[in-house]
Amino acid sequence: MRHNHGYRKLGRTSAHRKALLKNLAIALVENQKIETTVIKAKELQSYIEKLITKASEGSFNAHRAVFAHLQDKNATNKLVVEIAPKYSDRKGGYTRIVRTRLRKGDAAPLAFIELI
C-alpha cells in the first residue's frame, strides 16, 4: 500500500476527479470566489496555484499549457491576460481558504476559496 502519494481521491475515479477539478478551477477563475467543501478547496488550491504560476510566464506555450488543463477559452484568456499579471511579483499563495459553515444535509465542512 503506497501512502503519501500527494493528492486526495475525493471518492471518484481519476477521470471524474480530473473533471471536477477542471470545473471548479473554471468557476474560480470566472467568479474569483466559490464555496465548496474544505477538502475539495484544498485540492483545488494546489491545482489552481500551479496554473497561475504557469500562466504568469505569459508566453504562447504557457497559454497553451493552461488551455490544456482548463479546456475553456474564456477562462484561459481571463487567467492569462487578467489574473496572472496581478501576481507577477508573488512566488505563490495566490488563493485563500476561509472555512465557513457545516452543510445542513450531511454536516460536511464548507469553505470559501478565493483569489487574493
Swiss-Prot record:
Any GO MF annotation of the entry: structural constituent of ribosome
Xref: SUPFAM superfamilies: Prokaryotic ribosomal protein L17
GO terms under biological process: translation
GO terms for cellular component: cytosolic large ribosomal subunit
Pfam families per UniProt: Ribosomal_L17
InterPro entries: Ribosomal_bL17, Ribosomal_bL17_sf
Keyword Aminoacyl-tRNA synthetase appears in the UniProt entry: no
Superkingdom to which the source organism belongs: Bacteria
Subunit structure: Part of the 50S ribosomal subunit. Contacts protein L32.
PANTHER family: LARGE RIBOSOMAL SUBUNIT PROTEIN BL17M, RIBOSOMAL PROTEIN L17
Family in the record: Belongs to the bacterial ribosomal protein bL17 family.
NCBIfam families: L17
Name under which the protein is recorded: Large ribosomal subunit protein bL17
Classification of source organism: Bacteria, Pseudomonadati, Campylobacterota, Epsilonproteobacteria, Campylobacterales
Gene that produces this protein: rplQ
